[in-house]
């Protein structure tokens, strides 16, 4: 992707090459120079509790059973209501469907934060952070790791 001139100037001033992802954080380390590389061992240590944010895996258009955990209807005795959501509201009195009613739709592919994950190990040679638990997003995606307060 081509960066615009203000962003290129911002990176040039910091002495950093154009990168795929540019994020801004509060500096967790004192006395860090502009454009300096922040290593994982400077910020995290084993046993620390962190929260990890990222874009969850998109699952496309899903029904209410998969998306919201609705129960399905009976499969036998002539029922044709196996995977349908059921009633979506009252009749003539409200004369409408209330906002926010859980229905079928696009599932996943949104920002999710997994909280309370424990740092198992920090590998300084590879700049790796090992965390116990699930991390949002597909393999190879970018995540944001922050200290839990």
Spans of features found by a protein language model:
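Extended basic (Lys/Arg/His-rich) segments that typically form rRNA-contacting surfaces
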Residues: 1-149
């Amino acid at each position: 992707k081509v960066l615009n001139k203000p962003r290129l100037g911002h990176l040039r001033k910091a002495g950093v090459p154009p990168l795929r992802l540019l994020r801004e954080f509060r500096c967790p380390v004192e006395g860090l120079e502009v454009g300096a590389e922040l290593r994982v061992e400077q910020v995290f240590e084993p046993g620390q509790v962190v929260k990890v944010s990222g874009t969850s895996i998109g699952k496309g258009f899903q029904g209410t059973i998969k998306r919201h955990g609705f129960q399905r209807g009976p499969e036998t005795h002539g029922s044709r209501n196996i995977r349908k959501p059921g009633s979506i509201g009252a009749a003539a009195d409200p004369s409408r469907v209330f906002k926010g009613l859980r229905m079928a739709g696009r599932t996943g592919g949104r920002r999710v934060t997994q909280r309370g994950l424990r740092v198992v190990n920090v590998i300084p040679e590879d700049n790796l952070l090992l965390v116990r638990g699930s991390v949002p997003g597909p393999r190879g995606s970018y995540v944001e790791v922050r200290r839990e307060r």
